A protein has these predicted regions:
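A short, internal acetyl-CoA/4′-phosphopantetheine-binding micro-motif in the GNAT/acyltransferase core
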Residues: 64-71, 100
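Conserved GNAT acetyl-CoA-binding A-motif
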Residues: 87-100
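Acetyl-CoA-dependent GNAT
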Residues: 4-62, 67, 86, 118, ...
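Conserved active-site alpha-helix within GNAT-family acetyltransferase domains
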Residues: 77, 101-118, 123-127
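Short loop/turn motifs at secondary-structure junctions
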Residues: 60, 91-93, 113
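Conserved acetyl-CoA-binding loop-helix of GNAT-fold acetyltransferases
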Residues: 72-85, 110-111
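A general lysine-centric signal
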Residues: 94, 133-134
Length: 136
């Protein structure tokens, strides 16, 4: 698998799979190198990961998407570890992510060393678990 920064040519692929972000923000994140594209050996897109900054100073992984037929084969773990290394190289010591309490992703992140750091209660959604990881 290959991990690269998303470009304008990846816009439709991302837009068609990410209902949680506005179309204009996708373009902004592409230009800011805040979306990674996962590609298979044929150079076909198989997934993506996007991030931002919590409090504008702590890298926060917003979402990982892996196309159905490529799931459970290590692509998610690979992109998380890649992102962690990128953030470490940029000088960050702490990173964050979150997942809903009714999703299995919480176990995935804990296996990768993320620790529960709190939660967010929203009116219409399950509890959102905040997770952090120290990169030192």
């Amino acid at each position: 698998m290959k991990i690269v920064f998303a470009t304008d040519s990846d816009y439709e692929y991302i837009r068609n799979r990410d209902p949680h972000i506005s179309e204009s923000l996708i373009l902004s994140k592409i230009k800011g190198n805040e979306i990674y594209i996962l590609r298979n050996q044929d150079e076909s897109n198989i997934g993506w990961m996007r991030y931002g900054y919590f409090w504008d100073n702590t890298p926060f992984m917003n979402m990982i998407w892996v196309d159905e037929q490529y799931r459970d084969k290590g692509a998610g773990k690979q992109v998380v570890l890649f992102w962690e290394e990128q953030m470490k190289q940029k000088g960050f010591n702490l990173i964050m992510t979150s997942t809903q309490a009714d999703e299995g992703a919480q176990h995935f992140y804990r296996k990768l060393g993320y620790k529960d750091a709190g939660c967010l209660i929203l009116d219409t959604q399950p509890l959102e678990i905040l997770l952090t990881k120290n990169l030192n």
